[in-house]
Design a protein with these regions (language model features):
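Eukaryotic proteins' extreme N-terminal regulatory segments
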Residues: 1-16
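Helix-rich interaction surfaces within compact, conserved domain-sized segments
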Residues: 56-102
């Protein structure tokens, strides 16, 4: 469950007294069945990132999809994919964080 701690830290880092009043993290169940994860990215490092929707469907019961557009990470997956979807978001944050940090060092 370390990924939940990581998400808590990411959320806390972005709470600045204003951001959390309009933006945040939403985790819901969907009727496929499965999970939906929406994470607002306005005023964050990923605000201007765009990733086209990608659906990875191994079987009817083993699937997930995700995108980043309109300053939001949107992902959904089968009932076993909740932690995976959060890990996926973490990997995207870390990828762009590395790019951002390297640009700062130039």
């Amino acid at each position: 469950m370390d990924i939940i701690k990581w998400l808590e830290s990411w959320y806390k880092l972005n709470c600045d007294g204003d951001w959390e009043h309009s933006y945040g993290v939403k985790i819901e169940t969907i009727d496929n069945p499965g999970w939906s994860v929406k994470i607002d990215l306005v005023n964050t490092l990923l605000e201007n990132v765009h990733i086209e929707y990608s659906l990875i469907e191994s079987t009817e019961t083993d699937w997930y999809g995700y995108s980043i557009k309109n300053s939001a990470f949107n992902a959904a997956g089968d009932p076993t994919k909740l932690l995976f979807l959060i890990e996926l978001f973490k990997s995207i944050v870390e990828e762009y964080d590395t790019v951002y940090v390297s640009k700062l060092l130039e």
